[in-house]
Amino acid sequence: CIVRKVAGTLRDSVYAQMLWAINELGLNDEFDNTVSPLEITYKKTKQKIYFRGCDDPIKLKGIKTTFGYVGILWKEEKDQLAGEAEERNVNQSVLRGGDKSYDFSSYNPPKSKSNWVNKAKEVPNENRVIHHST
């Protein structure tokens, strides 16, 4: 599942980026995509990539897979979330029902060192990998 703070920003950003990547890899014939709901499906296994906004918590909690569970969460522009409480709510809403999950975040670090996302990354966590790129 890929989330952003505002659902209306998904289609022209991460959804388009994922479709671009599928095309670049020459895998168009292996995936189906829909815009309502915003999803990409791997034809062979029927696994889905869900795209959801955090501006409607009910829709996040309403994600129910036809089989398995959501095991990967990517929070795009994580710094736009209201804080750690909202992030925790997103995690608990999406990553449930399975015994193993992966949680990815991407964002441009805010200039203010006191921003919640900058503070949170400074807290030691042996299960976390932080990668900086430009």
Regions found by a protein language model. Give the residues of each.
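Phosphate/NTP-binding elements of NTP-utilizing enzymes
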Residues: 1-134
